[in-house]
Amino acid sequence: MNDKINHLIKITGWFTVIFFLLLIIVSCTVWQIGWIDIISYTVTISTFITIGYERFMWKWKLFRIFNKQADISGDYEATLRYFYGESGIKKVSVEIKQTFLTVNIELRSDEITSNSITADIIEEHGKNILYYTYITNPKAEFEKKNPINRGTTRLIVGENELTGKYWTGAETTGDLRLKKLK
């Protein structure tokens, strides 16, 4: 996360310098702007551009040369293979929402919904890995069989799929494979 914050600070610095210089050039050539106005406009424009960059501009091809952050946002169909007493396979849907600094994951099945508590994509041995901790919220009819639980997932980020493993505090483990929907 610190690398991402440092990157965002550098991008903000560059935006600020560029807009400041552009406004000085405009002030000297086109229309007279006072120093206080130049500083005010620079801060305002840089703030909005930084917010836009953090929310969505970092995904644009133009800005991809400045960062290597994987864009995994979207809807996925997933196969969950679980091992706990009995084992089985379950089809689930996953929605990933992402900004430059945050990742939020929601997994839905016929029995539960789980939401990420913390999540981050890190580089591990040259690969992007999504780690996230989650809490489950079972439907009332499944609460005794599948109570509220906390767990962690480690997924290797591929082009259009994520694959990996999860484990929980109830000693449940399993494999998870997500395929991005178009």
UniProtKB/Swiss-Prot annotation:
It is found in: Cell membrane. This is CD-NTase-associated protein 15. Disruption phenotype: Loss of protection against phage in S.aureus strain RN4200. Its main location: membrane. Belongs to the CBASS Cap15 membrane effector family. Effector protein of a CBASS antivirus system. CBASS (cyclic oligonucleotide-based antiphage signaling system) provides immunity against bacteriophage. The CD-NTase protein (CdnE) synthesizes cyclic nucleotides in response to infection; these serve as specific second messenger signals. The signals activate a diverse range of effectors, leading to bacterial cell death and thus abortive phage infection. This system triggers membrane disruption without lysis. A type I-B CBASS system. One of its GO terms (cellular component) is plasma membrane. Coiled coil: none annotated. The chain crosses the membrane at residues 11-31, 33-53. The keyword NAD does not apply. GO terms for molecular function: nucleotide binding. The C-terminus forms a minimal, eight-stranded beta barrel that probably oligomerizes. One of its GO terms (biological process) is defense response to virus. The gene is cap15. It is a multi-pass membrane protein. Keywords: Antiviral defense, Cell membrane, Membrane, Nucleotide-binding, Transmembrane, Transmembrane helix. The beta barrel domain oligomerizes; in the presence of cyclic nucleotides (probably 3',2'-cGAMP) higher-level oligomers occur.
